[in-house]
């Protein structure tokens, strides 16, 4: 089953979430080369500029889980940590009709 992942990041000290964009672009450039990657979208909250939401789509949950364990992803994600006021929130959903 296709998998959608909502990734929410909130920057610290009122810092605009757009500071995360170079890191997100770098992560996506790596993700597009991973097995099972379908697409990704990035949203910046207009009412709360410190908040960013990424929606990532994968062909299977297993592909997403493999990506989460990728050492390069872990390193790039760690580069964003200095900007974050809270822990990155991941919510994984199945895509489709039952």
Predicted regions and their residues:
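Short, glycine- and small/hydrophobic-rich beta-strand elements in well-ordered beta-sheets
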Residues: 28-53
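An amphipathic, aromatic/His-enriched active-site/gating alpha helix that lines ligand/cofactor pockets
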Residues: 32-39, 57-91
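Flexible, low-complexity linkers/stalks enriched in Thr/Pro that connect modular domains
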Residues: 43, 92-94
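Short, surface-exposed ligand-recognition loops at beta-strand->loop->(often short) alpha-helix junctions
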Residues: 10-22
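Short hydrophobic/aromatic beta-strand micro-patches
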Residues: 11, 55-57
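Generic recognition of well-ordered alpha-helical segments
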Residues: 22-26, 78
């Amino acid at each position: 089953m296709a998998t959608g992942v909502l990734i929410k990041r909130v920057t610290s000290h009122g810092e605009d979430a757009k500071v995360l964009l170079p890191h997100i672009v770098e992560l996506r450039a790596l993700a597009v080369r991973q097995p099972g990657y379908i697409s990704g979208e990035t949203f910046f909250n207009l009412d709360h500029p410190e908040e960013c939401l990424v929606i990532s789509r994968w062909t299977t949950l297993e592909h997403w889980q493999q990506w989460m364990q990728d050492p390069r992803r872990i390193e790039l994600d760690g580069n964003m940590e200095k900007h974050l006021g809270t822990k990155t929130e991941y919510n994984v959903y199945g895509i489709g009709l039952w």
